[in-house]
């Protein structure tokens, strides 16, 4: 049986898709098909301005729903709660690093950056979190693939940039670039960072069920439960991180109208439901309902 696997065309997206494709090849003949998305076409637009439309997702899932591809591979953090009708995330593979990292032009850490240093990031969450640690920092928008971001840093457009460690590692750049990783307790990552999701049409989930990593799936669902009940996207600075061990450790951080941080240990059996309640409570406290 042959599966056509849909993906974005960036180096990072292809690296993620190849990781999935190698596993699919254990059972299927695999063809990779590139689909352009809004996020690829409008490269100068900050992601928070896309407002929940799924800048890197919708075109892929539409191709899936229309039968142009059989499977779509996503970075799960980009997948909105509202999906293209007829599609479903059917599996996730084991999570890569959820952490954000700082890469500076001269090897400085966050603490060592000069006063008023310029940090490249378009993420409102990263800006808000870094400002709490270093209120003197200045921020400039930064989009593009990792190679582009690193080139702009080297050219002197920024003193430092912040990116996801998972992306560096998937492209093998972690061996070439010196960086400072931020533990999730310090810079709480966005929900589902470091997780690769595999989507299928509804009713065809069994095609990829053998790929699913249960620990990562639980972490993903807990984080998404919080975000869904909060009712926010990347236009609001929110970090949510879950780590499943004997219990599920959950950290939520909101930096909007006021600062709120919650840390809880949840039972595995009821973690998703408990996380949803936490999301509801946080929404009430910040937005009044």
Curated annotation (Swiss-Prot):
Which InterPro entries does the record cross-reference, listed alphabetically? HemC, Porphobilin_deaminase_cofac_BS, Porphobilin_deaminase_N, Porphobilinogen_deaminase_C, Porphobilinogen_deaminase_C_sf
One Pfam entry name: Porphobil_deam
Q: In the record, which positions carry S-(dipyrrolylmethanemethyl)cysteine?
A: 234
A GO cellular component annotation here is:
cytoplasm
Task: Please give the catalytic activity noted in the UniProt record.
Answer: 4 porphobilinogen + H2O = hydroxymethylbilane + 4 NH4(+)
By its UniProt entry, which SUPFAM superfamilies does this protein fall under? Periplasmic binding protein-like II (SSF53850), Porphobilinogen deaminase (hydroxymethylbilane synthase), C-terminal domain (SSF54782)
GO MF annotations, alphabetized: hydroxymethylbilane synthase activity
Query: Which pathway, per its entry?
Result: Porphyrin-containing compound metabolism; protoporphyrin-IX biosynthesis; coproporphyrinogen-III from 5-aminolevulinate: step 2/4
Query: Which Gene3D superfamilies does the record match to this protein?
Result: Periplasmic binding protein-like II, Porphobilinogen deaminase, C-terminal domain
Per the UniProt entry, what are the Gene Ontology biological process annotations, in alphabetical order? protoporphyrinogen IX biosynthetic process
Cofactor note text: Binds 1 dipyrromethane group covalently.
UniProt keyword terms in alphabetical order: Porphyrin biosynthesis, Transferase
Transferase recorded as keyword: yes
Cofactor dependency: dipyrromethane
- EC assignment: the record states 2.5.1.61
The UniProt record lists the keyword Transferase: yes
Q: Which family does it belong to?
A: Belongs to the HMBS family.
Q: Quote the PANTHER family the UniProt record gives.
A: PORPHOBILINOGEN DEAMINASE
Question: What's its job?
Answer: Tetrapolymerization of the monopyrrole PBG into the hydroxymethylbilane pre-uroporphyrinogen in several discrete steps.
Further remarks about this protein from its record: The porphobilinogen subunits are added to the dipyrromethane group.
- What's this protein's name? Probable porphobilinogen deaminase
């Amino acid at each position: 049986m042959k599966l056509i696997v849909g993906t974005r065309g960036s180096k990072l997206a292809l690296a993620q898709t190849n990781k999935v494709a190698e596993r699919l090849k254990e059972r299927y003949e695999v063809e990779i098909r590139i689909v352009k998305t809004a996020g690829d076409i409008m490269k100068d637009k900050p992601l928070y301005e896309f407002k929940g439309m799924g800048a890197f997702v919708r075109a892929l899932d539409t191709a899936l729903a229309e039968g142009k591809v059989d499977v779509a591979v996503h970075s799960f953090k980009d997948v909105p709660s509202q999906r293209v009708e007829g599609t479903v995330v059917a599996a996730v593979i084991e999570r890569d690093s959820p952490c954000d990292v700082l890469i500076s032009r001269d090897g400085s850490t966050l603490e060592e950056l000069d006063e008023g240093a310029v940090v490249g990031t378009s993420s409102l969450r990263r800006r808000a979190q870094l400002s709490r640690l270093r209120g003197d920092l200045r921020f400039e928008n930064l989009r593009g693939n990792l190679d582009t971001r690193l080139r702009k840093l080297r050219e002197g457009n920024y003193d430092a940039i912040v990116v996801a460690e998972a992306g560096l590692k998937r492209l093998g750049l972690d061996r070439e670039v010196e960086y400072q990783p931020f533990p999730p307790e310090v810079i709480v990552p966005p929900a589902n960072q470091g997780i690769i999701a595999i989507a299928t049409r509804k009713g065809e989930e069994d095609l990829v069920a053998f790929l699913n990593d249960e620990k990562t799936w639980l972490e993903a669902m807990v984080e998404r439960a919080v975000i869904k009940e909060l009712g926010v996207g990347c236009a609001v600075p929110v970090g949510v991180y879950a780590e499943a061990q004997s219990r599920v450790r959950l950290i939520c951080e909101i930096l909007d109208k006021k600062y709120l941080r919650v840390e809880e240990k949840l039972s595995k059996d009821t973690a998703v439901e408990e996380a949803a309640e936490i999301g509801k409570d946080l929404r009430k406290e910040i937005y009044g309902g």
